[in-house]
Amino acid sequence: MITIKKGLALPIAGAPSQVINDGKTIKKVALLGEEYVGMRPTMHVRVGDEVKKAQVLFEDKKNPGVKFTAPAAGKVIEINRGAKRVLQSVVIEVAGEEQVTFDKFEAAQLAGLDREVIKTQLVESGLWTALRTRPFSKVPAIESATKAIFVTAMDTNPLAAQPELIITEQQEAFVAGLDILSALTEGKVYVCKSGTSLPSSSQSNVEEHVFDGPHPAGLAGTHMHFLYPVNAENVAWSINYQDVIAFGQLFLTGELYTDRVVSLAGPVVNNPRLLRTVVGASLEDLTDSELMPGEVRVISGSVLSGTQASGPHAYLGRYHQQVSVLREGRDKELFGWATPGKNKFSITKSFLGHIFKGQLFNMTTTTNGSDRAMVPIGNYERVMPLDMEPTLLLRDLCAGDTDSAQTLGALELDEEDLALCTFVCPGKYEYGQLLRECLDTIVKEG
């Protein structure tokens, strides 16, 4: 067992009951283009086209052959683009059950399948995009290979679902997915989990590793740091446990599996719980009649690292397994910094809230102040369990010093790995965004 001591278990109210319920009927689904780092689409459809489930919607010019497919059958009603014609979303109005089918196999055949057969089926179904590289968090090139695939079978994000509940429902598919991953690499498949028992693969190159501790103990970046440190030469791939289930279902049934169990939670959710929905689901549909009155912010993903779901982006992200909702913190409090703060959380214990052990806080979107200088008072070191110098790294990101940032470990990280640093930063810096700018510069400069 690898125990993480540094980090933060965010004491936020609105945790979900760990029972899976059926979500509301989803009328619209979407693929969000900006989730895929560096992707430039070649469109295969236009507004008004009827599409089948698993039909190709677009391909990636920058990553030849990688296909992005429809999560449901229906009619393309929107293709949204932003500045410089960046693809924001392709929206489908759900209708019908038509779908593209694929080859299916017996469970005993999967581990012995040829790697090219597996790759072809994953690419054609669109499930290849469930894999992400580290460094850079991109969809892997089709002809690339890796010595390490990390399965994130735990979740320490605030308000998250317990993965074992979902995996237990789909044991055969989960094991089948692990067998497929084992055949996809000549190296190892690292299944990273909490202390709970999970169904396991019998393949010799599939290893289980137990992690314990506060967030970010459940992130792929943390697992890689301790088991297979990555750099420009050592590239690892990662995948979440629900996509492993989707891999297994694809090969066992010959059909694209797009079901997704998400946590709908937060201080302003009427009944926080786990809901069964689909990849790319409209969050307007999913949260209908579920939220308390007032101005709220719906977030696809974690409150720490998720994306605001509004307008063309109001859909469940490809890599997200929770929907978090916070009240918009627009109310200003006169001399708020001088009050005792019984109902306020602070990592530096600046308020009385820390005295009441186990207290949960109705957190909002407020940053409690305006932007200011980055002040190194030890906050970053409290929440960074990786063996690196966070203050120096974050300063380099602010300054745009890519060479020094690489030396200090920037290539190991993804935006979610710095989310806690953003949360505890007294200067209100968005370190995930700065990291992405740094990584993009490194890619451009070769």
UniProtKB/Swiss-Prot annotation:
Domain of life of the organism encoding this protein: Bacteria
Protein keywords: Ion transport, NAD, Sodium, Sodium transport, Translocase, Transport, Ubiquinone
Chemical reaction(s) catalysed: a ubiquinone + n Na(+)(in) + NADH + H(+) = a ubiquinol + n Na(+)(out) + NAD(+)
EC number in record: 7.2.1.1
GO MF term (any one): oxidoreductase activity, acting on NAD(P)H, quinone or similar compound as acceptor
Family of this protein: Belongs to the NqrA family.
Function summary: NQR complex catalyzes the reduction of ubiquinone-1 to ubiquinol by two successive reactions, coupled with the transport of Na(+) ions from the cytoplasm to the periplasm. NqrA to NqrE are probably involved in the second step, the conversion of ubisemiquinone to ubiquinol.
Quaternary organization: Composed of six subunits; NqrA, NqrB, NqrC, NqrD, NqrE and NqrF.
Protein name as catalogued: Na(+)-translocating NADH-quinone reductase subunit A
Origin species: Vibrio campbellii (strain ATCC BAA-1116)
Lineage: Bacteria, Pseudomonadati, Pseudomonadota, Gammaproteobacteria, Vibrionales
The gene coding this protein: nqrA
